[in-house]
């Protein structure tokens, strides 16, 4: 079997990893072996956190809606149940935005949910 020297291919593969590791501290950004480990870890974290971000924002919206709803004298669960019964189709992201940016209109939404 013929011997294969992997000069160009190996260099390109290593440089690709080192390019991804640019900005990492110390040997993590300059030495291929540690850079490869750090890049794999970083990509795993990025994949996981893209999914976690959706959960985190939903929790944030719910906390904001709950705080604003309690100021208006109703709990989060009663507010959401009332909105469902009143057939008010507005999502949590928009409700949280209303609660922060325009409390007066949020109060009108709460009164619609109460009745």
Swiss-Prot record:
Family matches, as Pfam families: Ribosomal_L20 (PF00453)
GO biological process, one term: ribosomal large subunit assembly
Record flagged with keyword Magnesium: no
Keyword line: Ribonucleoprotein, Ribosomal protein, RNA-binding, rRNA-binding
GO cellular component, one term: ribonucleoprotein complex
Higher taxonomy: Bacteria, Bacillati, Cyanobacteriota, Cyanophyceae, Synechococcales
InterPro entries, sorted: Ribosomal_bL20, RIBOSOMAL_L20_CS, Ribosomal_protein_bL20_C
UniProt xrefs under PANTHER family: 39S RIBOSOMAL PROTEIN L20
Function, as annotated: Binds directly to 23S ribosomal RNA and is necessary for the in vitro assembly process of the 50S ribosomal subunit. It is not involved in the protein synthesizing functions of that subunit.
Protein name: Large ribosomal subunit protein bL20
Similarity annotation: Belongs to the bacterial ribosomal protein bL20 family.
GO molecular function terms noted in the UniProt entry: rRNA binding; structural constituent of ribosome
């Amino acid at each position: 079997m013929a011997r294969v020297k992997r000069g160009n291919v190996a260099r390109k593969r290593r440089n690709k990893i080192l390019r991804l590791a640019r900005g990492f501290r110390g040997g993590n950004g300059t030495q291929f072996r540690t850079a490869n480990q750090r890049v794999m870890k970083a990509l795993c974290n990025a994949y996981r956190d893209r999914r976690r971000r959706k959960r985190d924002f939903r929790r944030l919206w719910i906390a904001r809606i709950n705080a604003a709803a309690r100021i208006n004298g109703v709990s989060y669960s009663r507010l959401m149940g009332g909105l469902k019964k009143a057939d008010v189709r507005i999502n949590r992201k928009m409700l949280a935005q209303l609660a922060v940016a325009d409390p007066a209109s949020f109060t009108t939404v709460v009164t619609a949910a109460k009745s």
